[in-house]
Amino acid sequence: MTKLNLWNEGDPVILRGVYNNHPTYVQSVRVIKDTPEETALLVLPGAECMVPDGYIHHAHDASKWDRWQETLANSVQLEKFTWRTNRFLILLEPEKFYSTIYIWEAASDQFVCYYINFQLPFQRTRLGFDTLDLDLDIVIEASHEWQWKDMDEYQRGIRMGGIQSDWVKSIEHAQSEVFARIEKRAYPLDASWLNWRPDPNWSAPRLPENWDEIN
C-alpha cells in the first residue's frame, strides 16, 4: 500500500463481512481502482472465498440455516469455497450504505445486470476492506427496470436485532439516492464500466493465510 493507504491496480486483497469482530464471509478480489472517492474490486471465477457452511449446504432451507441466528451468536462456521460463475465488478464509495456491482456471465462475457448491495460503509484494513452485507438488494436490468431482492431476509434481520435501527435509517436514505441514480441514469448506473475487461494475465486470487485476522 502507498503512504495514502491506497492499493494499486491488480493488487490481490480480501473483501470481508465482519460482525462483532468476527468474519462472516471472506472473498478474494483484485483491486481495479482505489482512490479517495471510489474503489473498484474484481471477483473472478476461480477466486477463493470463505462462506458460511450453512449457506453452502442449506442456503434455501431456512429450517436448517439461519444467517442472523448464527451471526448474533458469533457461531458462524466458514468453509472454503471457489467462486465459479459470474464476474463481478464491485464499486465502493466511502461512507455509503451500499455498493454498486456490474455482473457479467463469465462464459459468454454477456452483461447480466447492475446490482445494488446494501451494506455497512466499508473500512480499510491491512488485508483489504471490511463491511457487512445487510441482505437487502436491488437488481437493475440494462434497461434500468428494477426489482427488490431478499426483502424477507432483510426484514428478518431487523426483527432479530441483527440489523440495527440506525442502519435501517441510513439504508432508507441510501435507497433515495439509488432511485435518483436509476432515474437519471447517473454514474455508476450509466454503463461507464460496461465495456471494461480485466487484464487477461490476471489469475483468480487466493486467500491469504491470515484472512481471519481483525485489525
Task: Walk through the language-model features, giving the residues of each.
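Charge-rich, low-complexity N-terminal segments
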Residues: 1-85
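Short acidic-glycine loop/turn motifs at beta-strand connectors
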Residues: 34-37, 106-108, 140-143
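Hydrophobic residues embedded in beta-strands of well-ordered beta-sheets
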Residues: 38-40, 111, 146
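Short, solvent-exposed aromatic-acidic interface loops
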Residues: 45-50, 120, 151-157
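A short, polar/proline- and glycine-enriched secondary-structure boundary/capping micro-motif
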Residues: 50-56, 126-127, 157-161
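Structured beta-strand/loop patches that form or line metal/cofactor-binding pockets in enzymes
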Residues: 82-136
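A hydrophobic, small-residue-rich beta->alpha segment in the mid-to-C-terminal subdomain
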Residues: 134-181
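Cysteine/selenocysteine-centered motifs that mediate thiol-based redox chemistry or coordinate metal-sulfur cofactors
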Residues: 173-215
